[in-house]
């Protein structure tokens, strides 16, 4: 009886811990679901920036590209090169997915450094870059997982699952575990880097508010771009691996 009571108390303690939140959050009720309003607001802003800039740049395409059209053509060519390198000759259908991931993460990361989110007052909590929230990075990582499972099943059918027993069935648990660790590593890498960058800038601004934080902010912009590239490259690599076989 004592063992059973102890187990129940332990489970209750774990349940209580799972409900602990860091900081304050603003929630909306949509239907029967409770959603994180701060992430939705900042994500909508990022999506609006991407859609607005692309529409303005290419609404009247020219034979001789203008500055905006030329920039977006360069970005598209860059994303195509990344996709082709990681996926191979069948990269074409995956360019929109990889491009969407790269651009959303890139603009989200930069918005944390360039947009004055803090001046917008909310009833609870405060606004920040979408990728500063673990919910966003986990969602992006899960989308990537769905994408590479879909790519593998589309290319190989049920034979795709044969990779789990290659090169030997003994590795079955490890190969299964690998598919679970991929989204974890993607999400926590992106979340940790963006959160750490913003925290460093906030601390330096509070200590030395004039000159010192500026180089750190420029470094943060650089690392934010690198993180977007790493995420997109790994997503393309996982898709290419699922289509070609186990490496």
From Swiss-Prot:
The chain crosses the membrane at residues 38-58, 95-115, 134-154, 199-219, 220-240. GO terms for molecular function: proton-transporting ATP synthase activity, rotational mechanism. It is a multi-pass membrane protein. Keywords: ATP synthesis, CF(0), Chloroplast, Hydrogen ion transport, Ion transport, Membrane, Plastid, Thylakoid, Transmembrane, Transmembrane helix, Transport. GO terms for cellular component: chloroplast thylakoid membrane; plasma membrane; proton-transporting ATP synthase complex. It is found in: Plastid, Chloroplast thylakoid membrane. The keyword Ion transport applies. The keyword Plastid applies. SUPFAM superfamilies: F1F0 ATP synthase subunit A. It holds the Pfam family ATP-synt_A. It comes from the Eukaryota. F-type ATPases have 2 components, CF(1) - the catalytic core - and CF(0) - the membrane proton channel. CF(1) has five subunits: alpha(3), beta(3), gamma(1), delta(1), epsilon(1). CF(0) has four main subunits: a, b, b' and c. Belongs to the ATPase A chain family. Key component of the proton channel; it plays a direct role in the translocation of protons across the membrane. This is ATP synthase subunit a, chloroplastic. It comes from Morus indica (Mulberry).
């Amino acid at each position: 009886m004592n063992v059973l009571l102890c187990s129940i108390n332990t489970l209750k303690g774990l349940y209580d811990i799972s409900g602990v939140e860091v900081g304050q959050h603003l929630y909306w009720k949509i239907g029967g679901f409770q959603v994180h309003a701060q992430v939705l607001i900042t994500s909508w802003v990022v999506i609006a920036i991407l859609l607005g800039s692309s529409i303005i740049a290419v609404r009247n395409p020219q034979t001789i590209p203008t500055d905006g059209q030329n920039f977006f053509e360069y970005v598209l060519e860059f994303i195509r090169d990344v996709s082709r390198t990681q996926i191979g000759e069948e990269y074409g259908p995956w360019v929109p997915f990889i491009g969407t991931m790269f651009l959303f993460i890139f603009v989200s990361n930069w918005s944390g450094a360039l947009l004055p989110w803090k001046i917008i007052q909310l009833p609870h909590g405060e606004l920040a870059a979408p990728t500063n929230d673990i919910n966003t990075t986990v969602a992006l990582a899960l989308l990537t997982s769905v994408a590479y499972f879909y790519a593998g099943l589309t290319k190989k059918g049920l034979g795709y699952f044969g990779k789990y027993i290659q090169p030997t069935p003994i590795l079955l648990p490890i190969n299964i575990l690998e598919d679970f660790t991929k989204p974890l590593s993607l999400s926590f890498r992106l979340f940790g880097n963006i959160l750490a960058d913003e925290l460093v800038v906030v601390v330096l601004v509070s200590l030395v508010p004039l000159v010192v934080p500026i180089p750190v902010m420029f470094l943060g912009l650089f690392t934010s771009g690198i993180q977007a590239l790493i995420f997109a490259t790994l997503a393309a690599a996982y898709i290419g691996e699922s289509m070609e076989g186990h490496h």
